[in-house]
Amino acid sequence: MIGTLLEWARTHKEGKLRALFWLYRWFRFSVVPLIYERGISLRPDWIPGYYALGNLLALKHSSMLSTRDHDVRKASKVGQRALECFQKVITLDPEYLEGYQDCSSMLVSMGKVAEALHVAERAFNMQRSLAERYQLDRLGIRFISSVGATNSIGAMVHVDAYVKAEVFGLKPPGKPILLVKPGQSIHNPHFLNYWRQYITVISDPTTVECLLPLVRYLEDAPHWGVMCGKQFLYHPSAAAMIYKLWEDERRPPLLTLSRDDYERGWDRLKQMGVPKGAWFVCLHVREAGFKDGISSQSAYRNADIETYLLAMKNIVARGGWVIRMGNPTMKPLSIMEHVIDYAHSELRSDWMEVFLCAQCRFLINTSSGVGAVTASFGVPLVLTNYMPTCALLYSSQDLFIPKLCWSMDQQRYLTFEELMSPPVSTSVLQHQYDYMNLKVVDNSPLEINDLVTEMLDRLDGALVYSAEDEQLHERLRTLTAVNGTLYGLDDFPINCRIGRDFLRKHASLLPLVDESETRPTLSCSETEHPANSFPNNEDVTNE
């Protein structure tokens, strides 16, 4: 319903029905909440009223922050009231599982990840208790949340980790099942088909309807949080831990490209001008438009395709081809030799996207979901303009460089310690950076090209790291372990490697070797999220 309204809003908010849209928006966000507030004042134990008001205010909170000139403090007051409503729901009815889920999501949007995870863990424990009460745990099944598995291709990386967790006995026992409701959108149906060997996908309407009542008691949401053994972990941290275990045992990737996809994929490439046997690199640079819509909350993850031209020319000069991935909403590329703008090709298809990700020499990516496909096939990643750093879940074969953050208050770059620690490392929405008065700084064309060169040299067997390079690398890895970059994992360093030249260039941002020296740090007022600044913001775990 919400998605339909947002789509309608995108279509009509600037058209002939603009006035009607804003009238509807005013009524929904200003009048309806007052009606619910009045109802709650008359009936303080009205659970559906609290829940409906909480969801309405959560939507208003998101809408307020999606505008370019948003007021973070005003929006935070709305978000705080939404949080209070969800807290009240689970206080009045501890078995109201949906209340935990929305409360947890609200806490994340307010920058309170620790509390959000605690609430999510409480929800998991309550769910398990209810399943045992009704003996549903004896069925030997678990449902995978369809929100992550179908709506976003990026969330499929957590399905990959979820399946691997089963191998290690780290997830709740049970046959994994994914329900696809009638009319439910699937981002890439062909990629989902590859996972049918590991999970049972059910789309028959009658069967889905019969099983849906069981979902709330037996559902796992690997795109949000995972119970790994006895520890409930934030999804990127869970994936990082599982990927490390998988790599340490030298296990192969779960997916292998089918013979049919291999043959027709190379036939399609030939149509595009790429000779069979040529090597190619895929490139995906996230831009506003595809998922952002009217929202700017993911703006910090975007980058400019023009800053990748130098790296493209480098690949071509070394005998390769570049396949630019994406969709037609993206900025078109100018014509370049041995560069194919597949994002604007009439030959785009879901199966071809899978083929390209599985067959490329490596993928140059930003903080976008396509990396989930390549990772599932074991293809190396070159992660550029990467944020947030808590999502650095990939393997030692992958390289990355993060965006840096400039403190507008102190007129300096954040150190790696600050960048790799909460609250910056766990800031998943643009307004969280705005509140800390941080300007997110994109990688330069030279920095991107240096990282691509490093991967090319590595794959060619020509890469050399000096003793100083290794020392800098270990200092950064140690920093990520000590400061909890992978949130919730104690003394667990990131596994992927930061770009050699990037680290050389910004070595001054590493902790000082001489501990007697001092360096300015962000003050408490700069690092606190607005939710922490308002009175009566009680910890939901105390209720």
State each model region's role.
Residues 49, 99, 132-133:
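TPR alpha-solenoid repeat register
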Residues 278-291, 305-349, 467-471:
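Catalytic donor nucleotide-activated moiety binding site of glycosyltransferases and closely related
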Residues 39, 88-89, 123:
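Canonical positions in the second alpha-helix
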Residues 226-271, 396-528:
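Leloir-type glycosyltransferase catalytic cores
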Residues 160, 353-399:
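A donor-sugar binding/catalytic signature common to diverse glycosyltransferases
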